Amino acid sequence: MSNTILQKARDYEEEHSAAISAAERPAYHLTPYVGWMNDPNGFSFYHGKYHLFYQYNPYATQWGPMHWGHAVSTDLLHWEYLPCAIAPDSTSDNGPGCFSGSATEMDDGRQLLMYTSVVSEKQPNGEMRDIQTQSVAVGDGLDYEKPACNPVLTQKDLPEGYSKFDFRDPKIWREADGTYSAVTVALTEDGSGAAVLFQSKDGFDWHFVTVLARNNNVYGKMWECPDFFPLDGKHVLMVGPMEMRPSGEFHNGHNVIAFVGSYDEKTHTFTREQVQLVDGGIDFYATQTTQAPDGRRLMTAWLQTWSDTEDKPQGCKWFGQTICPRELHLKDGRIVQTPVRELDAAHGKRTLHENVTVQNETVLAGIGGRIADLTVTVAAGEYRSFTVKLAADAAYHTRLTYDPYTSLLTLDRSCAGSRADIVHTRSCKVRSQNGALKLRILLDKNSVEVFVNDGEQTMTAWIYTPQSADGITFAADGQATITVEQFELNL
């Protein structure tokens, strides 16, 4: 099969991308070149730029045959679109398409993409089923070729009893000695997921190493979108569990969870020591990390979940976006997240209100807008609740409410203009500090990202509220003393 399918996608991009103006996109969150985006893929630093690929249907604002969209950036805020990287145009991926994967640099300077290749195959009972294998493509950062050795991993490379129908999402990296490693997820004989490690000397000939972790039906069923990386002296395994019932902090339906533990590189043994929810908001899935040239561990994710993909503004020309990339660290054995420091370099006009006492709904001069970096610090006190309204006018708002007695922070977009039959609220329990609370809030037209107490928790959601609703207000039940700092963003 020739690459005419890829060229068709590239021609479509060139013809239709001009119909989407910069004003119709977020200011610093990546959206698809055209059409639909879901999982971010191939997040990497290659030849002086950050590369971010993504699951992509260029032809419609809904899921369809999966291609890989492609964009590059030098600062993680401004993204340049490149032509579609790969398309379902080979015998190993000519079914639903080229599913999620990752990227790394090869010894010869080429970039290696590793992805889940899917074909539809007739089963003995006559049923058509999608078979998932892993394939590679090699290129120069713009154009990629699929070698004849594809697929490079199939069911025969898995432990006995693992499913060929659920075997996907390879995350690839290079070891210190140059070895290629990749973690995938697969469905085990007990009907739940496992993280499986493979290795290769050249990136093409792969072999099974070990099962890093099994779910054993504890955290949902099948796992998706694995990542495995060192962080501040520990190792982290991130996965997206499917069909996970609410339990404790794991309550947002499409969780991303992180196991923090110790990894023995000689025996390839990962010992889990604790587990946590990665984001407690409404719209956050399919994480992927990379290491920056300066050593920082950076994370991106899909700012969406599968349960509300039909809720989009009428006439929208694109669908799906990624989060503002985040820096990851460990604090007391748990992951903390902060916006990438590149965002600080975009800070423009600063507005500061210190030690303001609020009770009834309060508007502060110079505080507002839909593109902003806002920090709200609430002093310890005896107030009963505190609320920030974002993207607000007489008809719309998204609300953050903190109850110091239960230590619950609630994100509520029920008045944001979304449909009535999707999830509107999520709550997370934050560290109790006698009412003291710090919220850093990133606004970007269609989204809100909240970093609680310097990133100990985060909450993320899209908000398809009319852009004219740009007010920000503060209120308390009782009296709360707050300091508010807002930076406009020069983007």
PLM features: residue spans?
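Juxtamembrane/interface motifs at transmembrane-helix termini
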Residues: 229-230, 479
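Beta-rich accessory regions
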Residues: 10-15, 260-491
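Beta-rich carbohydrate-recognition and catalytic domains
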Residues: 1-169, 174-218, 230-279, 303-353, ...
